[in-house]
Swiss-Prot record:
Annotated GO CC locations: cytosol
Subunit structure comment from the entry: Homodimer.
InterPro entries: Aa-tRNA-synt_II, aa-tRNA-synth_II, aa-tRNA-synth_II/BPL/LPL, Lys-tRNA-ligase_II, Lys-tRNA-ligase_II_N, Lys-tRNA-synth_II_C, NA-bd_OB-fold, NA-bd_OB_tRNA
Membership in a protein family: Belongs to the class-II aminoacyl-tRNA synthetase family.
Keywords carried by this UniProt record: Aminoacyl-tRNA synthetase, ATP-binding, Cytoplasm, Ligase, Magnesium, Metal-binding, Nucleotide-binding, Protein biosynthesis
SUPFAM superfamilies xref list: Class II aaRS and biotin synthetases (SSF55681), Nucleic acid-binding proteins (SSF50249)
Protein residues bound to Mg(2+) 2: E413
Binding site for Mg(2+) 1: E406, E413
Catalytic activity: tRNA(Lys) + L-lysine + ATP = L-lysyl-tRNA(Lys) + AMP + diphosphate
Protein name: Lysine--tRNA ligase
Organism: Sulfolobus acidocaldarius (strain ATCC 33909 / DSM 639 / JCM 8929 / NBRC 15157 / NCIMB 11770)
């Protein structure tokens, strides 16, 4: 059999030839199934302190990927690995006969093997499976790379290779999904129900962001990938579900950098008859539970710009946005004129949203630039200017502000929460104001969602809501400064992914 080797795939010609020769002899190098009695993890649990050199467990069948091959005359050794664990195999001529030499003709690093044999310890005290039979389960056509020489771009583009040969990448994923599981368990314990909302939506909303657009051929309509989970979760609240949450993907057609990926994972929850104070307490309790469960400590280590910080989750600071900016500037922000704020914006190279110098939005921009990097320890920043969101309830005692908080850790926004706006008349007015902002050049202005206002018009109880960026939380728990390290398949140029 003759194959034209696709250079883009980088198949090894010798390996392809082995596959062809095996197939010509009726041997399938990619069989349908292999029965194992023990995983490598199971075998590692059978370790004994007395380390007998005679076999102590018999007819063990397992499988793994070949890490290295060490041929030594009539006795050779091979390491295989699976699920992050390694196992040494011992091959003997007197056990395998003619299949001993054949092994080295057809097996290479990277191949997946099924093996059967007896468990013992070598003279050096290493747990070893002395094999009596082996089966090639998947012939690798590409030589495994030298992981130490791989660029970050290669690792992100070919994540399957990264997971195989980079223990840290594998550990990051284990922490990621353990964290998500723990969040679910915590919310279940508090009586929340997990629900689903549409990913494709006729009107995007719930955040200030640019959407991805698609076209529904059957309807001949443009729809959007969701930028938030908020508006449909609130419809659940209107419908009588009092405690709901969703953990899902959202999509924002914006920047790609160390803390942003256009496709990311968000937790949102909504709690009827609660306000942002209740949500603040819930957030603190949940994060303390997650950090302690995942890290076995209330403290984590996190590096920023080469400096390592100890972040303590046992206590959370609280400060208003105005007070935090006043602290940094050394000047009372409430007493600053709009012209002073505009001058400060210009001095810091900040552009206003939609080219409009609106006081509340200038305060938010200055906060993001000047205060956010200083918030290393967990800090709830409270009471934002009313102009910053059209979906939050006005503050009950502070005119011009809304009952909103964001949680900052390690100089990053981690969570956003409101006492949710449930007055349909005010919601209608704010959506219309957003439309005026859009007409004046603000591309991130919130669109008018008629059905959402209609839902509020049926009556939504007082509600507290929360959003947490799961990816940034995982960055903290794994001490990673780049979001690409903790997203399994981060967004890259298609050219980078398709080309080696």
């Amino acid at each position: 059999m003759f194959h034209i080797i696709d250079l883009a795939l980088k198949w090894d010609e010798r390996r392809v030839k082995i596959v062809d020769e095996l197939k010509s002899k009726g041997i399938n190098p990619y069989p349908h199934k292999y029965d194992i009695t023990h995983t490598i993890i199971d075998i590692k649990k059978m370790e004994r302190s007395d380390k007998p050199t005679d076999a102590f467990a018999f007819d063990i069948s397992t499988a793994g990927r070949v890490a290295n091959i060490r041929r030594h005359g009539k006795i050779s050794f091979v390491d295989i690995f699976d699920e992050g664990e390694r196992l040494q195999l011992q091959l003997r001529v007197n056990e395998l006969g003619d299949r001993y030499d054949k092994f080295f003709e057809i097996v290479d690093r990277g191949d997946i093997l099924g093996v059967k044999g007896d468990l013992l310890y070598t003279i050096k005290g290493e747990l070893t499976l002395r094999i009596k039979d082996y089966v090639l389960l998947s012939k690798s056509l590409i030589e495994p790379p030298d992981w130490s020489k791989l660029s970050p771009e290669f690792r992100y583009a070919h994540r399957y290779v990264d997971f195989l040969y980079n223990d840290l990448a594998r550990r990051n994923m284990e922490i990621r999904y353990s964290t998500i599981r723990r969040i679910r368990e915590f919310l279940y314990s508090k009586g929340f129900m997990e629900v689903e909302t549409p990913i494709l939506q006729p009107v995007y909303g719930g955040a200030l962001a640019k959407p991805f657009m698609s076209h529904v051929n059957y309807l001949n309509e443009n729809w959007y990938l969701r930028i938030s989970l908020e508006l449909y979760l609130k419809r659940y609240i209107v419908g009588g579900f009092n405690k709901v949450f969703e953990i899902g993907k959202v999509f924002r057609n914006e920047d790609i950098d160390v803390t942003h990926n256009p496709e990311f994972t968000l937790l949102e929850l909504y709690w009827a008859y609660a306000d942002y104070n209740d949500i603040m307490r819930l957030t603190e309790e949940m994060l303390q539970d997650v950090v302690k469960n995942i890290n076995n400590d209330s403290k984590i280590k996190y590096s920023i710009g080469g400096k390592e910080y100890t972040i303590e989750f046992s206590q959370f600071r609280k400060i208003t946005m105005i007070d935090s900016l006043t602290e940094v500037l050394g000047k009372d922000v409430d007493k600053m004129s709009d012209e002073e704020l505009k001058s400060l914006m210009d001095k810091n190279g900040l552009k206003p949203r939609g080219n409009m110098y609106i006081r509340g939005l200038m305060i938010e921009k200055l906060f993001d630039k000047l205060v956010t990097p200083t918030l290393i320890q967990p800090t709830f920043v409270l009471d934002y200017p009313v102009e910053t969101t059209p979906l939050c309830k006005p503050h009950r005692s502070k005119q011009g502000l809304v009952e909103r908080f964001e949680l900052y850790v390690a100089g990053m926004e981690l969570a956003n929460a409101y006492t949710e706006l449930n007055d349909p008349i005010i919601q209608d007015m704010l959506f219309k104001q957003e439309q005026e902002m859009f007409k004046r050049g603000d591309e991130e202005a919130h669109p008018y969602d008629v059905d959402f206002v209609r839902a509020l018009s049926y009556g939504m109880p007082p509600t507290g809501g929360l959003g947490i960026g799961i990816d940034r939380l995982i960055m903290l728990l794994t001490n990673n400064m780049s979001i690409k390290e903790i997203i399994p398949y981060p967004m890259l140029s298609a050219k980078v992914i398709q080309e080696d």
